[in-house]
């Protein structure tokens, strides 16, 4: 059944003024018009990768706050909450923190849940139930074609169909610079893997090797070259492969004089050196900047190792500020190298170049998330042997290599197409769009 009550309806003139003063594209402007006029207590905005959802949400915040509403941002992870706040200006926190703190809301509250496709059913239900009791509005934002949620599963997909909401979608890719790549990602997102793969193949973006050693050597070499033209990230389907790639990257940087392993130190079972790029893997509010100001470390932060001393591990933030992590944080294994990340860890990250390495990550949602992280170029690396082995393990109906002529590129394509891992719930249908 649909949501029967109305909430968050604004004067169309107020919305028009806010849109006119913004730099929104037509699809973004339409989304704001629908969200502020439809009146559904629960609304859904599908924001595919690279379409500028946080920019659009910034205008949504502006128009609602001008009308006297309080806008709250929520996301499954601290990093996603931080990026939502930075991109939209909406004060944001994690869903878990919001539920624990039981923040007071009322009928003049709008709750924006970003990355809703990664949130569990129980968490989303709790947010909606609380909002419904007081008359607040909830806006679920996400993409049902990206990686599935890690909780109970299916909340966002179910909302697309069962909540009776006005579904709006951002459709213009504002991230990738090449038109062919924008088209290929859209094809991949909608399941047309054959056409998408052909485009990457045609533009020389697919690298197949005979064995894993050749694969990793080629990928690391290409990664080193691409680093000179922008921020470059390797992505893997498993933590084991990401770990191996990180070790190879560190050795290459040491060989080229870019990392001084003579001054490396061991802490928490891992070794680090000044200049190492690392990811912080747990929220930890009780840390401090070098000037003594308190600082909250958030899961997923990418930082650079500066030094280690008796006070802790000194790291450099992207802002240029330094944070001193207490030694116990690193000793618990909450710091890891970040030249290569798993695809799940990279969801929400944007960089210049992406190298997707190994067929373990080549299920459809995973490869879409990985390739859509890059602004300038994205590459696919796999060995023909790995692809064949994976095909044999899964009941795909593909003849074994002993039964037919082997085409490694076709095997890779079939692997991508047949190994979609999205855990759709029984409500997992396509959204009903409102134009």
What feature does the model see in each segment?
Residues 41-201:
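ASCE P-loop NTPase helicase motor core
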Residues 81-82, 148, 241-243, 386-391:
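Short, charged/polar "capping" segments at the starts of alpha-helices
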Residues 190, 291-292, 298-435:
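C-terminal accessory regions
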Residues 2-87, 246, 309, 314, ...:
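Conserved helicase NTPase catalytic core signature
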Residues 44-46, 74, 110-114, 139, ...:
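Structural motif
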Residues 91-99, 135, 139, 253-261, ...:
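Short hydrophobic/aromatic-enriched beta-strand-loop microsegments
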Residues 89, 128-130, 248-252, 294, ...:
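Short, solvent-exposed amphipathic alpha-helical segments in soluble enzyme
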Residues 1-18, 30-34, 43, 51, ...:
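Conserved helicase motor core of P-loop NTPases
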